[in-house]
Amino acid sequence: MLYPNQKTLATIAGVVVSPLNPMYTSLILSKGLKMGPLEGIKILDLSLYGPGRYCSMILADLGAEVITVEIPRSAGKMFGMMTSDTEAHYIGLNRNKKSIALNIKKDEGKEIFYRLAKKVDVILETNRPGTLKRRGMDYETVSKLNPRIVYCSITGYGQNGPYARRPGHDINFVAMAGILGLSGSKNGPPSYIVSPMIADVLGGTNQAVIAIIAAL
């Protein structure tokens, strides 16, 4: 499924994908520099929020071909700052990427996912542990279709342990780490450090980028 006002960019594994906000290309691509250290690497991004999208943005800037899987009818509505019909964070985090709207809860959507999984080099996801396993989209399943796949999962509390199934965002993690306790006035409550997203970026994005590149 293509989003409105977007032209077809490519067909991969028989699946048509489209450009994400083609008017907002990065400086590198707009200057006509076509090569990058990850040129030829294909990445399927199942993530929804900052850590995963920022990770695949960096990989796309390095030359990888990134295809983001969007929830139908929700593209561009997941972040906070609106610009016309598309949010500013969404535009920034999805530069240089392609997209496909896919309902992975349905058999048809999963079949398309499997076709793409056979052709890509990397799959990136940010679901809670066990979510994609229940849908038959976990590493064990995908690696049987594509033994060379690099499968990266970004989670808040790891794959196992007492907190593994808990949802969480940056503010939860920095609070648990005690960072919020270092902020604010001496006798007042802590103040949330708005930017940068310390836990999401340093603990999630950066480590994921390093791990993926190392695995490749």
Sequence positions of predicted segments:
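Extreme N-terminal basic, low-complexity initiation segments
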Residues: 2-8
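Hydrophobic alpha-helical signal/anchor motif
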Residues: 3, 18-20
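N-terminal helix-loop segment corresponding to the beta1-alpha1 unit
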Residues: 24-216
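Acidic, Ala/Val/Gly-enriched low-complexity intrinsically disordered segments
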Residues: 10-17
